[in-house]
Design a protein with these regions (language model features):
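Inter-helical loop and helix-membrane interface segments of multi-pass membrane transporters/permeases
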Residues: 2-24, 34-92, 121-144, 208-215, ...
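Helix-loop-helix connectors at the membrane interface of multi-pass transporters/channels
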Residues: 4, 37-66, 167-171, 176, ...
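Hydrophobic alpha-helical transmembrane segments of multi-pass membrane proteins
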Residues: 21-32, 77-84, 97, 144-155, ...
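Hydrophobic alpha-helical segments of multi-pass membrane transport proteins
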Residues: 37, 241-250, 270-280, 298-325, ...
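Loop-to-transmembrane helix boundary motifs in multi-pass membrane proteins
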Residues: 68-73, 184-190, 229-233, 241-244, ...
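Transmembrane alpha-helical segments in integral membrane proteins
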Residues: 75-93, 155-170, 241-254, 311-317, ...
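Membrane-embedded translocation segments of transport machinery
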Residues: 95, 102-244
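A generic transmembrane alpha-helix motif of multi-pass inner-membrane proteins
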Residues: 284-313, 333-365
């Protein structure tokens, strides 16, 4: 209802229709994301039973991702866990667990990063990650793709963060929280790069292979580590909790819209949203189909949702109203640069991403 609220503040209609675009983006990402989190759950179970450690990682990944309906139980269980989080309000419990799991996740990645540093040919991974190719800085596509990645990584989809923002206490310093989110997200991405890319080159894999790198390279590292089975289990469990939390964010936006627009109860709205995600996801469990869906959503739908959200906030609702809201919980005034950056620079850059999404072959992904 946030888009509708913004439009009504100007005496206009159509907010509900515009709001469906970012909601479709959230639902589309959730459909693909649930499949990947199902693979994470399967890998955690494999680490627990030992099958992950005794099987070739390529074979293990192929068995759970190469055909339709190849990971139905794990995929379904992930959706059920997410529905439980949303229906029974156990998000507080998940948040408490994540306060332990997220630091553990970082610690495990540091341990993995140290281990892979001693693998043969790991130096090529560090070169790939750290040696700059300056010519790409002058290629507009580099910047467009980087911003498109930021939309996805920081959930700037025009829906999920708006819904979660409505649940924050009034005295929350949103600016500080946003900055910390961006910093920690970047740190996590860099740490993952130091853990994964050297092992990619050590094992002769393609660094552009996508999500499968998580399920092939790291199990190979765990297989060569002392107590690797234990490390593998805790690693994938940490990723599982992070995945469930992110999935709940995406489906919360869809559920809230269903609850408001269709006049459903909270439980019915969650079941409808989760059921829709599962119903579609079951038919695209093969990694190539799932990848195609995620490409379409992240290349075309998410950037449009991002610019719609910004236009609604900074132009329709108004920059003055946004500044008033952002000052709640802050002791320092906002920078004078905030208004021009938000109204002009950010929206211009977001519009460029949308434009190039359609004219660059393959989009921005």
């Amino acid at each position: 209802g946030s888009y509708e609220f913004a439009m009504k503040s100007r005496g206009k209609k159509g907010g509900a229709i515009l709001g469906t675009i970012p909601l479709l983006g959230s639902l589309g990402i959730a459909i693909g994301y649930a499949i990947i989190v199902g693979w994470v759950l399967r890998s955690a179970f494999g680490a627990l039973t030992g099958s992950l450690m005794s099987t070739e990682p390529e074979q293990f990944f192929t068995e759970m991702s190469s055909t339709n309906f190849s990971s139905v139980p794990w995929h379904t269980l992930v959706i059920l866990l997410t529905a439980a989080v949303l229906i029974f309000g156990v998000s507080g419990g998940i948040e408490k667990i994540n306060k332990v799991m997220m630091p553990a996740f970082f610690i495990l990645f540091i341990i993995i990063a140290i281990r892979v540093a001693f693998l043969p040919n790991a130096i090529e991974g560090y070169k790939y990650l750290l040696v700059p190719q300056w010519e790409y800085l002058f290629n507009p596509r580099t910047w467009i793709m980087a911003m498109g990645q930021a939309f996805f990584s920081l959930s700037i989809t025009g829906s999920g963060m708006i819904i979660y923002g409505s649940y924050l206490p009034r005295n929350e310093d949103v600016v500080h929280s946003s900055c910390m989110t961006a910093v920690l997200d970047t740190c996590a991405a860099m740490l993952a790069g130091f853990a994964i890319l050297p092992s990619v080159f050590a094992f002769g894999l393609d660094p552009a292979s996508g999500p499968k790198l998580l399920f092939i390279t790291l199990p190979r590292v765990f297989q060569q580590m002392p107590f690797g089975r234990l490390f593998a289990f805790f690693f994938f469990i940490s990723v599982l909790f992070a995945g469930i939390t992110s999935l709940a964010n995406m489906l919360e936006a869809v559920s809230e819209a269903a609850q408001t627009r269709l006049k459903l109860s909270r439980k019915a709205a969650v079941l409808l949203s989760c059921g829709a995600a599962l119903a579609v996801g079951l038919f695209i469990e093969r990694d190539t189909l799932m990848g195609t869906l995620m490409d379409v959503i992240t290349i075309y739908v998410v950037p449009i949702g991002a610019i719609l959200g910004a236009v609604m906030a900074y132009w329709v609702l108004g920059i003055n109203k946004m500044e008033q809201e952002l000052m709640n919980g802050r002791s320092k005034p906002l920078s004078r640069a905030f208004a021009p950056l938000a109204k002009y620079v950010y929206i211009f850059l977001a519009a460029l991403v949308v434009f190039f999404s359609f004219i660059i072959p393959g989009g921005i992904g």
